[in-house]
């Protein structure tokens, strides 16, 4: 899915200026990367808030329009208000199509309900890590990674090497020879 966000350069910075922006329905943010100086920006709160609720937005290549120029960016970080449903700040990183990006991608369990551990042994598959750090070109970043649990039995431990990575995507931990556990399979308690 492609996301497009309109942004404007913000001149005033600081706590007071940020509060004024939020009252006007804007989110203060920053755009950095691609060998340029960081730029203080403001984006529409409603657009970003509802986009952040979608899991794919966190790893998507976003078209950010700023001063009539469109840049390819990814969401690098964001802060939420402690108890209101409100985004306080967002960081975008500009990326180049030919340079790999390091990003965390969500992990999904698939086929667990068909596994022997769940069907016959009454067990469950539990994620130890909900995301995996990968390196890929911006166009190759997957929205999520699947962990196939069709063949698991109670007592199994699934590792990074059990995840089938799409072409052009590499696990940061596996590159460092760290085959971390990502899920466990437990049987029914007696």
Curated annotation (Swiss-Prot):
UniProt-listed Pfam families: Ribosomal_L25p, Ribosomal_TL5_C
Gene it is expressed from: rplY
Described purpose of this protein according to its UniProt entry: This is one of the proteins that binds to the 5S RNA in the ribosome where it forms part of the central protuberance.
GO BP, sorted A to Z: translation
Assembly with partners or alone: Part of the 50S ribosomal subunit; part of the 5S rRNA/L5/L18/L25 subcomplex. Contacts the 5S rRNA. Binds to the 5S rRNA independently of L5 and L18.
SUPFAM superfamilies tied to this protein: Ribosomal protein L25-like (SSF50715)
Domain of life: Bacteria
HAMAP family noted in UniProt: Ribosomal_bL25 (MF_01336), Ribosomal_bL25_CTC (MF_01334)
Gene Ontology CC entries for this record: cytosolic large ribosomal subunit
Record family assignment: Belongs to the bacterial ribosomal protein bL25 family. CTC subfamily.
GO molecular function, one term: 5S rRNA binding
Keywords: Ribonucleoprotein, Ribosomal protein, RNA-binding, rRNA-binding
Protein name: Large ribosomal subunit protein bL25
């Amino acid at each position: 899915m492609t996301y497009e966000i309109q942004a404007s350069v913000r001149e005033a910075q600081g706590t007071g200026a940020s509060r004024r922006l939020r009252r006007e329905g804007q989110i203060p943010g920053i755009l950095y990367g691609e060998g340029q100086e960081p730029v203080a920006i403001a984006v529409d709160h409603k657009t970003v808030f509802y986009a952040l609720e979608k899991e794919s937005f966190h790893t998507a290549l976003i078209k950010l329009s700023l001063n009539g120029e469109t840049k390819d960016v990814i969401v690098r970080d964001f802060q939420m208000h402690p108890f209101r449903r409100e985004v306080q700040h967002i960081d975008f990183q500009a990326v180049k199509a030919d340079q790999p990006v390091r990003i965390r991608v969500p992990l999904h369990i698939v086929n667990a309900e068909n596994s022997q551990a769940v069907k016959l042994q009454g067990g469950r598959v539990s994620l130890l890590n909900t995301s995996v750090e990968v390196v890929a070109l911006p166009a190759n970043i997957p929205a999520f990674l699947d962990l196939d649990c069709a063949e698991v039995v109670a007592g199994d431990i699934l590792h990074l090497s059990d995840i089938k990575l799409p072409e052009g995507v590499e696990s940061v931990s596996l590159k460092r020879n760290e085959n971390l556990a990502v899920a466990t399979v437990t049987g029914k308690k007696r």
